[in-house]
């Protein structure tokens, strides 16, 4: 018989840097999950990723307090900021531009996020990411 799902917990945790401090500790502790077991498993799974990059994770907690988790790709905004080499987006994206990204960079981000996005094809995903870039105050070249 399948285990009964008790909860889904969605978090964003820095790759390779999960530890029992907030937000991980309180979110898992109130569900009775072994926090250190999650931290070790998460850090092992994300060790190949760039350290410190935020990684969305969905943790499924079962009634016997066991868990499984699925990592997603980093948010498009984070990947765009990294590609453009900026710290944050523009407060006034329509008037104040803070950086540029090329079509090739957008293609690369779309391919990386393809597994998590619901676009019909790669071109639709590229348009979506280009829209995110424009809303952050980035100029899209190409």
Swiss-Prot record:
Pfam families assigned: Ribosomal_L11 (PF00298), Ribosomal_L11_N (PF03946)
RNA-binding among keywords: yes
Gene Ontology biological-process entries: translation
Assigned GO CC terms: cytosolic large ribosomal subunit
Gene3D superfamilies reported in the protein's UniProt record: Ribosomal protein L11, C-terminal domain, Ribosomal protein L11/L12, N-terminal domain
GO MF assignments: large ribosomal subunit rRNA binding; structural constituent of ribosome
Membrane-traversing stretches: none
Domain of life: Bacteria
Keywords in alphabetical order: Methylation, Ribonucleoprotein, Ribosomal protein, RNA-binding, rRNA-binding
Database matches in InterPro entries: Ribosomal_uL11 (IPR000911), Ribosomal_uL11_bac-typ (IPR006519), Ribosomal_uL11_C (IPR020783), Ribosomal_uL11_C_sf (IPR036769), Ribosomal_uL11_CS (IPR020785), Ribosomal_uL11_N (IPR020784), Ribosomal_uL11_N_sf (IPR036796)
Post-translation changes: One or more lysine residues are methylated.
Free-text function comment from the UniProt entry: Forms part of the ribosomal stalk which helps the ribosome interact with GTP-bound translation factors.
Family designation: Belongs to the universal ribosomal protein uL11 family.
HAMAP family assigned: Ribosomal_uL11 (MF_00736)
NCBIfam families for this protein: L11_bact (TIGR01632)
Subunit structure: Part of the ribosomal stalk of the 50S ribosomal subunit. Interacts with L10 and the large rRNA to form the base of the stalk. L10 forms an elongated spine to which L12 dimers bind in a sequential fashion forming a multimeric L10(L12)X complex.
Descriptive protein name: Large ribosomal subunit protein uL11
Source organism per UniProt: Vibrio vulnificus (strain CMCP6)
Gene designation per UniProt: rplK
